[in-house]
Amino acid sequence: MDLLDVAGLDEIFDIIECSGVLHHMDDPAKGLSALIKQLKPGGYIKLGLYSEIARKDIVKARNQIKQLGLKGTADGIREFRQKVFQGQLKELANPPILGLDFYSLSECRDLCFHVQEHRFTTASLQNLLNTNSLIFCGFMLPEAVKKITSNSSPLTLI
């Protein structure tokens, strides 16, 4: 089902979770608006969106792909990964910074070759929420990040 057709479910929800979708839409605000119409008053929406900061290395990869004229085909993805592994792309000399998705063909396509990608800053996220009269409740951080932010000793990260 297309997210913009979610009203066709003819249901409203207490909680809506949307991850990995809005940032690939032509107009994420339009997608969010469609979801809000299916949310009960006082309900919650949990969003998973791309971060401008967190994806800085992915942006470098996407720029390299564009410069090389590579396509999101299996051959194009393999050629890109081969160039990274062979050290031909100096900005991307460390594949682990691209994450585990880099090593799977379908995941790498979504990671680096997707035709539509919006990335959010805290300011643009707040603007999106304000435009839709939503209240920001907080970020859900991975445990590893929580350890970094809540503990000053590097030894606790081992």
Q: Can you name each region flagged by the protein language model?
A:
Residues 12-14, 32-34, 52, 60-66, ...:
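Short secondary-structure boundary/capping segments
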Residues 4-16:
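A short acidic, Gly/Pro-enriched loop at the edge of an enzyme's catalytic core
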Residues 44-95:
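Conserved class I S-adenosyl-L-methionine
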Residues 13-29, 45, 51-53:
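A short SAM/SAH-binding and catalytic strip from SAM-dependent methyltransferases
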Residues 80-158:
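Rossmann-like AdoMet/SAM-dependent catalytic core
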Residues 9-10, 27-28, 57-60:
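Short, solvent-exposed loop/turn and secondary-structure capping segments
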Residues 14-15, 41-47, 133-138:
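Beta-sheet entry/capping signal
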Residues 29-44:
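A short glycine-rich, Lys/Arg-flanked "PGG" loop and its adjoining helix->strand segment in the class I
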